[in-house]
Amino acid sequence: IGFIDQYQPEYVVILSGDHIYKMDYAAMLRYHEQMEADCTIAVRTVPLAEASRFGIMNTREDGSIYEFEEKPKHPTSTNASLGIYIFKWSVLKKFLIEDEENPRSENDFGKNVIPAILNEGYRLFAYEFQGYWKDVGTISSLWEANMDLLGKNPAFNLYGEKGNRIYARNYAMPSSIIARESKNKNCFIAEGCEIYGTITHSIISTGCTVDSGAIVEDSVIMPNVHIESGAIIRHAIIGEDCRICRGAVIGGSFAPGEEKKISVV
């Protein structure tokens, strides 16, 4: 609280760290100001079968929230919180202090803080977000989000929009070497790689080496991985700095409609 107080902000944006999306926060802030809200929560409609994974809210026609429950066992709505909030700082500060002083509180944002603000009659509004959004809190959803970057018309497109910057801690690396004998289709290859094998529908992160005769399909390869000749990787996530030895087989294929079980190394 002291850190934020030194900037004396009127509003504070609270975000989750395991979600993938692109959003213009300025547009959400304009909505927040227009509705004279104390708190605005980004929402989207989810299937009822998945609603128990999210904070679920009921809203009036004007978008105001009159009910909020974190991960309900029996959800009464499909309006799911995306973990993106804008608060009046004075309001958030008050309830954070009160929550910390409450010995019965679990100190949980969704279970305690948001319901407390709502119960005291403050103005909470839902801001509907239509774009791509994915919670990558599971292995399968992390794999799916990476696969969504691929293809001619990807579900999550990193290109084609001016002004969108990607901030990362990657070191500056040389251009990748893509050997003439390599076979690559529908893949994303970052800088600093040496590619001699076959890669299909996969993400190859910085500094990776794929030797001649190695096969990578439908997989996510984290930075600085070396995949030796003859290794076969399918439907897998390989952690950074791994070495996949010659002839190793990781993962497999799935029948249509079969649940995808992603291998992890």
Enumerate the predicted regions with their spans.
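Unchanged
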Residues: 1-149, 257-263
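Left-handed beta-helix
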Residues: 90, 98-265
